[in-house]
Amino acid sequence: MSRPVGYGRYLEEFTVGQIIKHWPGRTITETDNTWFALLTNNQHPLHSDAHYAAQTQHGQRVVLGPLVFSIGIGLTVADVSGRAIANLEIEKIVHHAPTFKGDTLYSESTVLDVHESRQGDRGVVSVETRVRNQRGEVVMTFRRKVLVPKKTHPTLGDGNQQR
């Protein structure tokens, strides 16, 4: 199976301290939140009951946090894990501010660590991702570790080899 040219990065293309701005963003719709609530069976009224939510400190329904995370990480795939062999770890998910329908999310990742594995043809990249809304407010941060190939990896190297 071939991958789109420019989709994902090899281990050699990551450097500690590198900041990757993921584009484009993604605007959250009411349908997104409703379907995600149905898929995950999350029935909390803060997410589904407009009358209840209007009486809270937020004054309106709040988008589910796991949906914010899913969109936030999805925005990073083309730049961070598009060539991944595996996602190894996700940690330290922090909600900093609520997200509402109509908000547009943008992700930005900082490379925290890059090291080659013992196999020599792959390595682990650690990143911290900040998810911001259209006002530039950080709504969520999380860290993850991704196993990515080097350019010399026998089956994933150039991204165009058939399996």
Name every feature range the model reports, one short phrase each:
Residues 1-89, 151-163:
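Hot-dog-fold acyl-thioester-processing enzymes
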Residues 91-93:
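Conserved interaction-surface patches within small, structured recognition/assembly domains
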Residues 1-18, 95, 99-104, 108-163:
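HotDog/MaoC-like acyl-thioester-processing domains
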